A protein has these predicted regions:
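N-terminal capping/lid subdomain adjacent to the active-site entrance of alpha/beta enzymes
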Residues: 1-153
């Protein structure tokens, strides 16, 4: 049997980051933490994270939906269906369940990326800013070996 809880964590950006919806300095995330009562030392953790205005999840109902997940954690199939309008919570739940299956190792899938601990150098993100700031980011990402850059403009 599983038990669940969640905690909220506010990420503090190292630098203000421009998006099409404005400048981000902080971002809230919630961590869904599962524990198997048969193996209480093993935790599965999944991150539920949104960017307000860009994510379809309803922020006003977010924590009550997370509480609903915690109260109904042993009805996995029904939960996944009930979360259709909260894809970020659904993702966090699926991740936490996979982590429990992986004995809390955080190695959810066997892959070269996981085994070699090397980054996947695609989609280097370039944050919005003035021309010089963006050009410096582009130069750095290319030097790091990224083959595709995503510019926030």
């Amino acid at each position: 049997m599983l038990k669940a809880r969640f905690i909220k964590h506010t990420l503090q950006f190292k630098q203000a980051s421009g998006t099409s919806r404005g400048v981000l300095k902080t971002k809230d995330s919630w961590f869904l933490i599962l524990c198997d009562t048969d193996n209480p030392n093993t935790q599965g953790i999944g991150e539920c994270s949104i960017i307000e205005g860009l994510s379809p999840d309803n922020l006003e109902e977010y924590e009550s939906k997370l509480q609903f997940v915690c109260e109904n954690i042993n009805q996995k199939e029904q939960l996944l269906i009930a979360l259709s309008k909260f894809p970020s919570i659904q993702f966090g739940l699926e991740t936490a369940l996979l982590d429990i299956q992986a004995n809390g190792s955080k190695n959810l899938f066997r892959s070269h990326f996981v085994r070699s601990n090397s980054p996947i150098k695609i989609n280097g993100l370039i944050w919005m800013g003035n021309k010089d700031f963006m050009l410096e980011q582009i130069k750095t990402k290319i030097e790091l070996g990224f083959s595709c850059l995503k510019l926030k403009i």
